[in-house]
Amino acid sequence: MSDDHFDDEQEGSSGGPRHPMAARFRGYLPVVVDVETGGFNSATDALLEIAATTIGMDEKGFVFPEHTYFFRVEPFEGANIEAAALEFTGIKLDHPLRMAVSEETALTDIFRGVRKALKANGCKRAILVGHNSSFDLGFLNAAVARLDMKRNPFHPFSSFDTATLAGLAYGQTVLAKACQSADIDFDGREAHSARYDTEKTAELFCGIVNRWKQMGGWQDFDD
């Protein structure tokens, strides 16, 4: 299915002059998302953490990470959680300071913030940015389906994958190595936290987009 089917869904746009962010990404607002999970199967495995960073644009057309939303999430009823996944992420479900919320609470708050950013940037819909973005989008869509949420601001299948973009820009597809190549500080001890990975992915995405602009690409944002 072509994403043209979704072009008329005006989630956050309004009349008046077109905002440069909307012009840059064809009406879509990039929002970086990372999830930490109980496994690889979005239908059966728990969503344990989710973070989302909205992207802003300055008066010169350069993009930057704007605001991050982060939640530790209670596993949905009947969710599968692989021991290997917990070992990999370091998540301790019984930690007294974990303070997890329901999937509904997490997504409702994130979607509210995303809609606010859509309105501020004159964009019609959010497009997920992620490192290996199909994984994050799959878990997001699965949670939306479980909750029967009717107003999901994200495009259901299009995304920007920073693993692909970093492979093009830096010859690296691993997040830590791509960040190092882009002169972005990356602490491996903090990795696999949804907040940390989201914010580093946002820095990487903005760096690649801005580097392309500096090299002469996308100078005319009204095209």
UniProtKB/Swiss-Prot annotation:
GO biological process terms, alphabetically, are:
DNA replication proofreading; tRNA processing
* Cofactor note (record): Binds two Mg(2+) per subunit. The active form of the enzyme binds two Mg(2+) ions in its active site. The first Mg(2+) forms only one salt bridge with the protein.
| Assigned keywords, A-Z | Exonuclease, Hydrolase, Magnesium, Metal-binding, Nuclease, tRNA processing
Task: Output the Pfam families linked to this UniProt entry.
Answer: RNase_T (PF00929)
Q: Which InterPro entries match?
A: Exonuclease_RNaseT/DNA_pol3 (IPR013520), RNase_T (IPR005987), RNaseH-like_sf (IPR012337), RNaseH_sf (IPR036397)
For the keyword Magnesium, the answer is yes
Q: Per the record, where are the segments of Acidic residues compositional bias? A: 1-11
Q: Region (Disordered): which ranges?
A: 1-21
Q: Where is this site: Important for substrate binding and specificity?
A: 40, 88, 135, 157
List the cofactors. Mg(2+)
| Residues the entry annotates as binding Mg(2+) 1 | 34
Catalytic center residues: 192
User: Which residues are recorded as binding Mg(2+) 2?
Assistant: 34, 36, 192, 197
Q: What is its EC number?
A: 3.1.13.-
- Gene Ontology CC, one term: cytosol
> What residue stretches are annotated with the Exonuclease domain?
31-205
MF term (GO), any: magnesium ion binding
* Classification via SUPFAM superfamilies: Ribonuclease H-like
Q: Cite the record's note on assembly.
A: Homodimer.
Q: What is the stated purpose of this protein?
A: Trims short 3' overhangs of a variety of RNA species, leaving a one or two nucleotide 3' overhang. Responsible for the end-turnover of tRNA: specifically removes the terminal AMP residue from uncharged tRNA (tRNA-C-C-A). Also appears to be involved in tRNA biosynthesis.
Listed NCBIfam families:
RNaseT (TIGR01298)
- Protein name, as recorded: Ribonuclease T
Q: Which organism is it from?
A: Pseudomonas fluorescens (strain ATCC BAA-477 / NRRL B-23932 / Pf-5)
